[in-house]
Design a protein with these regions (language model features):
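Amphipathic alpha-helical binding modules
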Residues: 78-125
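Short terminal alpha-helical segments
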Residues: 1-42
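Amphipathic alpha-helical elements of HEAT/ARM-like alpha-solenoid repeat scaffolds that form extended
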Residues: 2, 10-13, 46-61, 92-93, ...
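Short amphipathic alpha-helical heptad-repeat segments
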Residues: 21-29, 75-87
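Helix-start/N-cap signature of alpha-helical segments
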Residues: 7, 42-50, 100
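Charged, low-complexity interaction regions
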Residues: 37-45, 65-67, 92-96
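HEAT/armadillo-like alpha-solenoid scaffolds in large eukaryotic assembly and transport factors
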Residues: 64-76
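Residue-level signature of the C-terminal ends
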Residues: 24, 59-63, 115-118
Length: 125
């Protein structure tokens, strides 16, 4: 295929690069989710980086560029169950304000759900 347009992502090399980037984001999330649950608590690095990676994947997928890959929707749903169980079990220990806790929960759930929806849409196209 080579090059199919003038855009920054309209060639095979860019598609390969995007695939490498999305694979890295997915691998980081998968590794964090398979690891020690303490590492994904809300005040830990992966507790912050996991939802950030998921949002980055959503942003990339919405662009429709060749090369962006997403995990299966069922995998995302399992990650959501695991992550939210850890989050719910540890957030109160950080003594957040009730408003922040509710808002953050909404954002986290939306982050997982939007990515799963994007994957399902990709599968149906």
């Amino acid at each position: 295929m080579g090059t199919w347009g003038a855009g920054n992502f309209e060639n095979d090399t860019a598609a390969d690069h995007l695939s490498i980037l999305t694979d890295r984001l997915i691998t980081e999330v998968a590794d964090a989710m398979a690891g020690d649950p303490v590492e994904i608590e809300p005040d830990e690095y992966w507790g912050v980086a996991v939802p950030a990676n998921l949002e980055l994947l959503s942003l990339l997928a919405r662009q429709g560029h060749v090369g962006a890959s997403l995990p299966e929707a069922e995998v995302i749903e399992e990650w959501k169950r695991t992550y939210m169980a850890v989050w719910e079990g540890s957030i109160d220990g950080l003594m957040p304000s009730p408003g922040h806790k509710d808002e953050r929960r909404t954002v986290l759930i939306r982050t997982f759900d939007e990515l799963a929806t994007l994957r399902r849409k990709e599968d149906s196209d």
